[in-house]
Regions:
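Eukaryotic serine/threonine protein kinase catalytic domain
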Residues: 1-180
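A short, hydrophobic secondary-structure junction motif
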Residues: 111, 259-260
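C-terminal regulatory tails of eukaryotic serine/threonine kinases
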Residues: 162, 168-259
Length: 263
């Protein structure tokens, strides 16, 4: 288990209050990167909130507490009402069916608001009143927020899940794109499905105590829920993230070390 020394994002917000826009954006970009990673691997968190977002010694966000998470299956919907009330989507507190990603998007919208404002968009000590506020989707918008980020928050806090922004729309939003580190969303490089990474296969074998032929068979089966295949693709993705991060650090090093321009 990884030790994360920076504490909860919640405590950071309590200590610092509303964050500067550039800092809020940096945290939010990392959160969306992590949520996107979960969704691409068919996992919906369902309890995203600052208390479940941890900070490491470099102030990088780590998503934690997957106790209420669930696997997404094609054509199937979820109904369980779970998560923290202040961050729960309208369809969740109403007991309606939901696919999964859209409820995480709502929670991320609440988190973004909290980062920028130091308060919650929907809050009340009386839970029924809180639920009524959430279902209306009406929340105060401070005058100091710029129009771009207000537009993004409003897209994420749409009561109708069909009108709510999805991950791809968030990633393409002009506010989100500012100073976006390339390693958070590595470019999708199409790989030859016939080429199998032997290092990743060996790592799966070591972790699960299986033979390489079993991993090969799992990959050939193309079963999206096979644990060996999932582990293999997670290893490949992690390596891709690490490679992109290393490139970014090297680029930053050369930029920082460049001589100043002549005046």
């Amino acid at each position: 288990m990884e030790y994360v020394s920076g504490g909860e994002l919640f405590d950071y917000i309590v200590k610092n209050g509303k964050l500067q826009e550039h800092e809020a954006r940096r945290f939010f970009q990392q959160i969306i990167s992590g949520v996107d990673y979960c969704h691409r691997h068919m996992i919906v968190h369902r309890d995203l909130k600052p208390e479940n977002l941890l900070l490491d010694h470099n102030m990088h966000v780590k998503i934690a507490d997957f106790g209420l998470s669930n696997m997404m299956l094609d054509g199937e919907f979820l109904r369980t009402s779970c998560g923290s009330p202040n961050y729960a989507a309208p369809e969740v507190i109403s007991g309606k069916l939901y696919a999964g990603p859209e409820v995480d998007i709502w929670s991320c919208g609440v988190i973004l608001y909290a980062l920028l404002c130091g308060t919650l968009p929907f809050d009340d000590e009386h839970v029924p009143t809180l639920f009524r506020k959430i279902k209306t989707g009406i929340f105060p918008i401070p005058e100091y927020l710029n129009k771009q980020v207000v537009n993004l928050v409003c897209q994420m806090l749409q009561v109708d899940p069909l009108k709510r922004a999805n991950i791809e729309e968030i990633k393409k939003h002009e506010w989100f794109q500012v100073d976006l580190p390339s390693y958070l969303f590595p470019s999708n490089i199409e790989q030859d499905s016939n080429v199998i990474d032997t290092y990743a296969v060996q790592e799966v074998c070591d972790k699960f105590g299986v033979k390489d032929t079993e991993v090969h068979n799992a990959l050939l089966s193309e079963d999206p829920h096979d644990q060996l295949a999932i582990a293999y693709h997670l290893i490949i993705d992690n390596q891709r993230f690490a490679d992109e991060a290393a490139k970014a650090e090297i680029n930053n090093f050369f930029v920082a070390g460049s001589p100043p321009p002549k005046l």
